[in-house]
Regions:
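Metallocofactor- and cofactor-centric catalytic cores in central/energy metabolism, strongly enriched
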Residues: 2-146, 150-164, 168-173
Length: 174
């Protein structure tokens, strides 16, 4: 997609924030045949199939610890349920993530707010006029983001004044 054929999205807040990002449910389909087929292809398709094969070996190895590392806003892009399912079904042993993934994205949606599909070509000045933030092609309602920040501040204000590790603070968030 380029700027010329990018979707024409409205000029008011409601028209910009009209298509929520949907999180993938990896339990709703069987991707094995697709991944196996990719092993006979080229470029990154074959690499993806090889990575899946290695991952399967890791899951089968009782002496292997699997760390999932996340950077950026992949949970806002629709991967949040994937991460939850990987933990739920013991497919990862640990997650190392940036604060954006845990605080600004997961906690934001835990409060009932949503991320919305948008366009990376949208004029940021127009978005700013409507109090909308953009992460590449994903939109966030700035009013809701500020509500999230206030909620975190209110929780922080109830804590005993001392230094907290990231884990301790995230635990306090719930």
């Amino acid at each position: 997609m380029n700027k010329k054929n990018s979707p024409k999205i409205g000029h008011n807040k409601k028209s910009f924030l009209n298509k929520p990002v949907e999180h993938i449910d990896i339990t709703s389909f069987d991707a094995r045949k697709l991944i196996e087929s990719m092993s006979k292809m080229s470029f990154t398709s074959r690499d993806t199939a090889k990575a899946a094969s290695i991952y399967n070996e890791m899951i089968s190895d009782k002496n292997c610890s699997i760390f999932l590392t996340l950077a950026g806003s992949t949970s806002a892009a629709g991967c949040m349920k994937i991460y939850a399912d990987l933990v739920k079904y013991n497919m990862v042993d640990a997650i190392v993530a940036t604060g954006a993934s845990i605080i600004d994205m997961d906690f934001f949606e835990a409060l009932g707010f949503k991320h919305y599909q948008g366009s990376q070509f949208q004029d940021d000045t127009e978005l700013r006029k409507n109090y909308i933030d953009r992460i590449y092609d994903t939109y966030i309602d700035e009013d809701q983001l500020q509500n999230c920040d206030r909620t975190i501040g209110e929780i922080a204000d109830t804590l005993e004044p001392k230094a907290y590790t990231s884990r301790e603070f995230i635990y306090e968030l719930g």
